[in-house]
Amino acid sequence: MTEESTKENLGAPKSPTPVTMEKNPKREVVVTTGPLVSEVQLMAATGGAELSCYRCIIPFAVVVFITGIVVTAVAYSFNSHGSIISIFGLVLLSSGLFLLASSALCWKVRQRNKKVKRRESQTALVVNQRCLFA
């Protein structure tokens, strides 16, 4: 395996590295380059946490939803219908519901994808087993 194919497999950046130019006190321009980060490198650095977005959103959504309930309850207890605080409470309430719904949707999609992958894997195993015993 060549070095270039290894870099492609590891997700090395395919475009040129970004360049930043700085001036130092002697009126010279210093050029520094910084590497680009690919998705594969990001997954390696975070341990694959970027694929668990729905798990991160749930606690935040619950806090926003409860805050929305409290703010809306306080606003309507003072009979301030249509005031800024009641609108803010309703926005928080709807944002919390939206985040919870999107988290549930992401979870469902992920479960469906896992089921499809599992089914494909079982199919490949059965075909391979038939080839071995045929």
Curated annotation (Swiss-Prot):
It holds the Pfam family TMEM100. Expressed in dorsal root ganglia. Expressed in neurons as well as nerve fiber bundles connecting ganglia and fibers innervating muscle layer of the gastric body, jejunum, and proximal colon. Expressed in arterial endothelial cells and neurons of the central nervous system and peripheral nervous system (at protein level). Expressed strongly in lung, weakly in brain, heart and muscle. Expressed in enteric neurons and vascular tissue in the muscularis propria of the gastrointestinal tract. It is a multi-pass membrane protein. InterPro entries: TMEM100. The chain crosses the membrane at residues 56-76, 84-104. The modification Phosphoserine is found at residues 15, 121. The keyword Secreted does not apply. Plays a role during embryonic arterial endothelium differentiation and vascular morphogenesis through the ACVRL1 receptor-dependent signaling pathway upon stimulation by bone morphogenetic proteins, such as GDF2/BMP9 and BMP10. Involved in the regulation of nociception, acting as a modulator of the interaction between TRPA1 and TRPV1, two molecular sensors and mediators of pain signals in dorsal root ganglia (DRG) neurons. Interacts (via C-terminus) with TRPA1 and TRPV1. Interacts with TASOR. This is Transmembrane protein 100. It comes from Mus musculus (Mouse).
